Amino acid sequence: MNAPDINRSILRMHVAAIEAKYPIKIVGLLPRGSVGHVFDDNAIEFLAEKRPGLSLLDLAGAEVDLGDLLGRQVGIVLVSGLKGHEAEELPRLVEPV
């Protein structure tokens, strides 16, 4: 897991708040380095499914808001955006929230 110092119940509470605010479903945690646009060593990376109505602005907002709640940078990868080898491998690496 890439977030050893975050209490799981607090993490689940913050994820639920983001899922209530944005049309997104967080599937789980990804290993550090899975998200290409996140460079902070303390970042947390998630795999998510988009729900109807999710825009790019919503996705960015979910990353920022969840990052604010967790106190560190967050990266979110959408299952629908995975192609080829990544589409097969990343879902296998997900750790439940």
What are these regions (language model features)?
Residues 45-48:
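Short, hydrophobic beta-strand segments
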Residues 1-39, 50-97:
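Catalytic core of pol beta-like nucleotidyltransferases
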